[in-house]
Amino acid sequence: MTITKNKISLMLNSKLGFSNNLCEEIVNTVFSNILEIAKVQKLTLKNFGSFEVKQKKQRPGINFHTKSPVMIASKKNLRFSPSEKLKALINKSMR
């Protein structure tokens, strides 16, 4: 099951009783702030996990169509590492 930002804002609306517009604004602001922080430094949310940008180096590869060697450009990847508490919670609910 996929949880969208819209579903999260509806959950906030039902729990807190705020308007739909305010809940959407809160969710969008939280996610945009998480992304902005994660772009420049490691972001750790206690009992949830951490977000970190990792730089992948340029590396050699092969063009599948022509079989010729190519250089794959360097790029940044956003990584999420779940906390031990989140892992335990997920594993507990799977049993």
Curated annotation (Swiss-Prot):
InterPro entries with a match to the protein in the record: Hist_DNA-bd, IHF-like_DNA-bd_dom_sf
Originating organism: Rickettsia typhi (strain ATCC VR-144 / Wilmington)
One Pfam family here: Bac_DNA_binding
Entry keyword DNA-binding: yes
Record's protein name: Histone-like DNA-binding protein
Any one cellular-component term (Gene Ontology): cytosol
Classification via SUPFAM superfamilies: IHF-like DNA-binding proteins
Keyword terms: DNA-binding
GO MF, one annotated term: DNA binding
